[in-house]
Amino acid sequence: EWVPIKPKTDAAFLFSLIHVLLHEMPREKLDVPFLKQHTGSPYLIGPNGFYLRDPATKKPLLWDLKRNAAVSFDTPDTDPALDGAFTLDAIEVGADEAMWTHRGITAETAFGKLAARVKPYTPEWAEKTCDVREGTVRRIAAEYVEQAQVGATVVIDGETLPYRPVSIQFGRTVNNGWGAYECCWARTL
């Protein structure tokens, strides 16, 4: 299906699509185990916008729901929180090895920050920007989730892998000119 989007407003459409996925779809429709175990979504973010890290190892921290504590991302047998605010002691390492030590800081997860960031980008907002009707955005988001077949697998060369028959493809002009960064960022999500 071709969806005519006003030129250079692809990011608005994609941000609203992400909004629907994170704020209007049931959480169990998303691949939560993948987000928890194979992405930086559960990593805790410091006040300067960088990952909070273990002071001894400098490994990124996440909040483990089993232990009710911050642990390094590679700690075995964890149940990482995707949402919430948690109090902990940690360091934050920024660009050029700038380092901040935090005591009793309250931090959120990367996923929580993303969800908050895209909350204002409703399909109604996008319709005014990119000329795609809000109902079309919601329908496409629902089709995307339905066709993703979360939990389904496929065997390739004897290895069982997650089956992911859904993707968003770039066209030539999407990544050229102003607005390209935002569009590429949203598309990558």
Task: Please tell me what each predicted stretch does.
Residues R138-L189:
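Acidic catalytic cores of enzymes that act on phosphate-bearing nucleotides/polynucleotides
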Residues W2-V155:
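Long, well-ordered, tryptophan-enriched scaffold segments
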